[in-house]
Amino acid sequence: MPARLPRRALLRTAPLTLLLAGCGFELRKPPSFAFQSIYLAVPPMSPLGLELQRALAASGSVSLVTDPRQVERADLVFELLQELREKVVLGRTSTGAVREYQLRVRLRFKVRNRQGIERIPDTEMVQQRDISYSESSALAKEAEEDLLYRNMQSDLVRQILRRLAALREI
């Protein structure tokens, strides 16, 4: 009897495995870019700019032009126009104390090629997360807030990379 149990389990899972393989499902691959070099016009200490630099360098197929005097060597120029973190009160208790916040990261950018032609026009991207607040756990909530901001920033960087990968003509 124990030898039949694994065989039954195998017979039950085999059709699901074949169905999943046949539907065309595959894991997301690293992006492939149509350009070889890019200049990032971002503020020097911008956390989003630093993460974007790391992500592009990790791709291995793109070289970063870091010297502003060498901008004309870059195939594309990424301009970060605005990076804004917001914290908005969502709810209050009956005594007027804050109960819930909404955290937002607002980002505006555009991408142009070496000739100055815009390849991605002025684009605004917004990420938002809700967070509850309690005076008794203020330090923990501050750490949670930092974590949420980092997660939103990472998500925005992934979205930017997907948009850059979608460019087929530079």
Language-model segments: residues:
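N-terminal secretory signal peptides and thylakoid transit peptides that target proteins
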Residues: 1-18
